UniProtKB/Swiss-Prot annotation:
InterPro entries: UROD/MetE-like_sf, Uroporphyrinogen_deCO2ase_HemE, Uroporphyrinogen_deCOase. This is Uroporphyrinogen decarboxylase. Homodimer. The keyword Plastid does not apply. Keywords: Cytoplasm, Decarboxylase, Lyase, Porphyrin biosynthesis. It comes from the Bacteria. It comes from Brucella anthropi (strain ATCC 49188 / DSM 6882 / CCUG 24695 / JCM 21032 / LMG 3331 / NBRC 15819 / NCTC 12168 / Alc 37).
Length: 341
């Protein structure tokens, strides 16, 4: 029997909708925090298949989500490209900013093969997950990954990357193309290892104007999709251009993704129009899970009422926060699964 999440990606309406959460294996879970301590560094956790499997399975055991998403990080790609990368408490990811000249020296040949521990994690997960649970792989979109490579860290509006793109257009285009090519190989390897579907995270797409969104977000993601589909024509792909606003319109058609992840700022009338084209995923404000109570219940109910009649994967509009109480996550799940169509 086809897994629920895959049925929705294929355009079927399933009610109650399947549910998973971005960052569902994360710091809000005490068992995650314990495993994280054992690993040493965050990257060690990402590159240790047994530990990465454990933290991926933790939210499945606790909550019975309909999908498990591979535990890793979008920045393993630049790390595999030879960029230094470290994660510091309270600061997030840090790396030495790349300059325009260095981009022309980047070599992409065989880079995806350096991420074998990630593929081993996928293989082990497919063996250990319940049959009904969808296994999702993922990568970061080239624009979002490039913003960290250029600034060396996250910034409020990723101004360093935008300025770099304006000043060094040729270097920036090469960087996006290189990242797209390696990311496509990376996703193909995940599908080889047993992933049922993959998601492309473009967390910083919302800081771009319309022209740059087309060049920096849509074209590189379309390049990834085309390369993946050359190997896996039936590959199921979710695109998540967070903060895209009105530019969500046309994203699915232009990139070729099957399902569209929405953030919580998307009006329901617009979301419903996007849903007429195919599956959508989202889009509860993560802070409603932190708040709990009526704020959570009303958020869940509204999504079910406005979007539950079409192909919907229930998710948050971004990753769950470390402050989210576990009991509120369970309350959300119970309310979704007890929902009325």
């Amino acid at each position: 029997m086809k897994r629920k999440v895959l049925r929705v990606i294929d355009g079927e309406t399933v009610f109650p909708p399947p549910i998973w959460m971005m960052r569902q294996a994360g710091r809000y879970l005490p068992e995650y925090r314990e495993t994280r301590k054992k690993a040493g560094s965050f990257l060690d956790l990402c590159y240790s298949p047994d530990l990465a499997v454990e933290v991926t399975l933790q939210p499945i055991r606790r909550f019975g989500f309909d999908a498990a998403i591979l535990f890793s990080d979008i920045l393993v790609i630049p790390h595999a490209l030879g960029r230094d990368l470290r994660f510091e408490e309270g600061k997030g990811p840090l790396m030495t900013p790349i300059d325009a000249d260095e981009i022309f020296w980047l070599e992409t040949e065989g880079v995806a093969k350096r991420l074998e521990p990630v593929y081993e994690t996928v293989r082990l997960l497919r063996e250990q997950l319940p049959d009904e649970t969808t296994l999702l792989g993922f990568c970061g979109a080239p624009w979002t990954v490039a913003t960290y490579m250029i600034a060396g860290h996250g910034t409020p509006d990723q101004a360093p990357a935008r300025l770099f793109a304006y000043r060094f257009p040729e270097a920036f285009e090469k960087l996006l193309n290189d990242l797209a090519d390696v990311s496509a190989e990376y996703l193909i390897e995940q599908l080889d290892a047993g992933a049922d579907a993959v998601q492309i995270f473009d967390s910083w797409s919302g800081v771009l104007d319309e022209d740059c969104f087309e060049r920096f977000c849509i074209r590189p993601v379309a390049r990834i999709v085309q390369k993946v589909r050359a190997v896996y024509p039936e590959a199921r792909i979710i695109g998540f251009p967070k903060g895209a606003g009105m530019l969500y319109a046309g994203y699915r058609e232009k990139t070729g993704v099957d399902a569209l992840g929405l953030d919580w700022s998307v009006p329901f009338s617009f979301a419903a129009a996007l849903q007429e084209e195919g599956a959508i995923q989202g889009n509860l404000d993560p802070l409603r899970v932190v708040a709990g109570g009526n704020a959570l219940d009303e958020g869940v109910d509204t999504i079910l009422e406005r979007l539950g009649q079409g192909p919907l994967i229930f998710n948050l509009g971004h990753g769950i926060t470390p402050q989210a109480p576990i009991e509120n996550v369970q309350r959300m799940i119970d309310r979704i699964r007890g929902g009325k169509s």
